[in-house]
Amino acid sequence: TKTRGIAVTYRAGERDIYGTCPTSCEMNCSGKGSQKIDPDYFAALLDAVPRRGVSFTYTHFAWHLWADRSDKDSTGQTVVNFSAKTLLSAAAASRVVPAVVVLPATEWIKGKYTSAPLLGGTNNRGDFIQTDAVRVVRCPAEYKENFSCGDCGSGSPLCARADRDYIIGFTAHGASKRKAADPETSGGCYADGGHVRLHWDATAKSDQDDETDADKLRRFAKGLKSGSIIRHHVAGDIG
């Protein structure tokens, strides 16, 4: 799997797998979720980096809601990637925060890269003419055999590089890949099926104690060995 060899976390609402996800996420067709970010959890997320290690995650919450709290130029902080709905929105966001996007398999050039329009305009026929673009690099684990996040970047995964000048692209996959690849269609969350869904369900059904998600996360990161890599909330979000 992509996450072989690294530490991962899951997050869910109480008895509600989508409870921490934004209601605005196009992949969330549950009708449930959160309309705001949990500030205590988000602060803990930024701090939850193993000693001499790196952490990264993704969020579907609009980047302008959290960008001022996540320093793109800071080291020793969890890298929060904005999961964009389209190539155009990914390109715009990438000027401020690290960005990723889900694409159909047909989008890739030679199977490894494409570009996202950053600037341009329309001609007198209404056609969009691109004048600038941002490079989109496909996740290497999608085309390299026996390759995982633990192998990526020699201990510095691409998604954990806050100062990168390119977007990371993922290919829509699974039973709902058509929905995932279409920003106009609701649904398609990869975590809503398979083994990820089993772990996500277990997280939502687990008994809640007095320890907050923020405290649990800090404790988890602190307990990992030096040099570890964490992918935070494989499923779930910062709400």
Language-model segment annotations:
Residues 1-239:
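Class I S-adenosyl-L-methionine
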